Swiss-Prot record:
S-adenosyl-L-methionine binds at P224, G300, G301, D302, I305, T330, A331, M382, G411. NAD(+) binds at S22, I23, L43, E44. CDD domains: SUMT (cd11642). It comes from Psychromonas ingrahamii (strain DSM 17664 / CCUG 51855 / 37). PANTHER family: SIROHEME SYNTHASE, SIROHEME SYNTHASE-RELATED. This is Siroheme synthase.
Length: 472
């Protein structure tokens, strides 16, 4: 972040605005709404400022700027139409370590004013850091249509009731859950929208007697990597969580969307390297839920497709813990789509099979005869370290050596890299790849040249030469 968003209390604080035109008027309006003690310095004044001065809403000084005007001031805004004057004001204010904003010149300002959606006491601020003010304005206009006017009343009445809630619910996480439940069902907002304040207060009171001490677990699929592929429900639960247990494949960009105060616990697993044993993960889910916490078990892709989700839920059922499951976009769907490879196609594949290259025990055998059948697409999760076995078994069971193969590395992310070759060279294709890699085997891979649409930031989308992969 170039700027840290901070809401500052300006009530009765002395503020100076230099400039008396329309731009200055807009800044002064905001300062007055926040209760600031405003002095305006200019050689000429907009008529509205003269009227406000006559009404004792602000003070005006009909003079040029001098550095003495900065004495005892807390905040300064330079809004003249003269660049040299504005720069002089900024330099003088910086020397006195005052907060200063120069309109239209973020580079010499110590703070900037965001676009604002005002539903006081609820206020939303949007800023592009001065880089795209029109974009920030358009976002504000969009939010204005989404946030109803009665949100201010909702926040105000909640503030009046906070002390009562603290008296009844002593534990902070349970208080948060009370408010989430109250705000989440929409009943309170509907009553206030209709002006039924007494009924709204009654609802808040009766809701205090409901049992909110029981924790629960949400098994959430985080998708294949791109944060924008998260479902709305997944994001909602991540924002409500007390504890999040996440896997190795969940990216930092997705973890950044979790509620700031939530505890983040890595229970990541890689083949042959279990950071936390599965049994311990199951135990933690039960323990945290019994403590009354809202627990999110965050897994890459979809929890029910090679994600051990079923094993974890069986443990919760035995312990009597309430749970819900939120599906995610599985790697096969996400990575194939971003690589331009349809998993089925009437001309090439009438079926698709998902298998994992990381099985529970080494002795488990796949039905290689069925997997080697033509006119189907085979998708292998976590198959990179088993490339030699997969190649050998498919070839020995009759799959053609020239069968197209794609390896989608770090799919759907800005680091996505797709390597395409033939089944006969599968072992060599993955030689230079590290990180999560999905294997797609079948004639549909030939469509990637035509249908590939996603150009990642860091690498070319397609490579057909293993040597190039090793150089990447």
């Amino acid at each position: 972040m170039d700027y840290l968003p901070i809401f500052t209390k300006l009530e009765n604080r002395p503020c100076l605005v230099v400039g008396g035109g329309s731009i200055a008027c807009r800044k002064i309006h905001l300062l007055l709404k926040a209760g600031a003690d405003v002095t305006v310095c200019a050689l000429e004044f907009n008529p509205s400022l003269l009227k406000q001065a006559a009404n004792k809403e602000l003070k005006i000084l009909e003079q040029a700027f001098t550095e003495e005007l900065l004495e005892n001031k807390w905040l300064v805004i330079a809004a003249t139409n003269k660049k040299q004057v504005n720069e002089h004001i900024a330099t003088a204010a910086h020397a006195k370590q005052l907060l200063v904003n120069v309109v239209g010149q973020a580079d010499i300002s110590s703070f900037i004013l965001p676009s604002i959606v005002d539903r006081s006491p609820l206020v939303v601020a949007i800023s592009s850091g001065g880089k795209a003010p029109v974009l920030a304005r358009l976002i504000r206009e969009r939010l204005e249509t989404l946030l109803p006017m009665h949100l201010g009343r909702l926040a105000a009445i909640s503030a009046q009731f906070r002390h009562r809630v603290k008296e009844v619910i002593k534990v902070a996480p349970l208080r948060r859950r009370y408010w989430e439940k109250l705000f989440g069902n929409g009943m309170l907002a509907n009553l206030l929208q209709k002006g039924q304040t007494e009924k709204a207060i009654a609802l808040m009171e009766t809701s205090l007697s409901e049992d909110i001490t029981q924790g629960d677990v949400a098994l959430v699929g985080a998708g294949p990597g791109d944060p924008s592929l998260l479902t709305l429900k997944a994001l909602q639960l991540m924002q409500q969580a007390d504890v999040v247990l996440y896997d190795r494949l969940v990216s930092s960009d997705i973890l950044d969307l979790v509620r700031r105060d939530a505890d983040l616990i890595s229970v990541g697993k890689a083949a042959g390297n279990h950071e936390v044993e599965q049994s311990r993960t199951n135990q933690m889910l039960v323990e945290f839920a019994r403590e009354g916490k809202k627990v999110v078990r965050l897994k890459g892709g979809d929890s029910f497709i090679f994600g051990r989700g079923g094993e974890e839920l069986e443990e919760l059922v035995e312990a009597g813990i309430a749970f819900q499951v939120v599906p995610g976009i599985t790697a096969a769907s996400g990575c194939s789509a971003y690589a331009g490879i349809p998993l089925t196609h009437r001309d090439f594949a009438q079926s698709v099979t998902f298998v994992t290259g990381h099985r529970k025990t080494d002795g488990e055998e796949l039905n290689w005869q069925a997997l080697a059948a033509p006119n189907q697409t085979l998708v292998v999760y976590m198959g990179l370290i088993q490339s030699q076995e997969i190649q050998t078994q498919l070839l020995s069971h009759g799959r053609a050596p020239e069968t197209p193969v794609a390896l989608v590395n770090k799919g759907t992310t800005s680091d996505q890299h797709v390597v395409i070759g033939q089944l006969s060279e599968l072992e060599q294709l993955g030689g230079g790849l590290q990180g999560p890699t999905l294997m797609i085997i079948g004639e549909v891979v030939n469509l990637a040249d035509k249908l590939a649409w996603y150009q990642s930031d860091n690498k070319p989308p397609l490579s057909r030469d293993p040597f190039l992969v090793n150089l990447a």
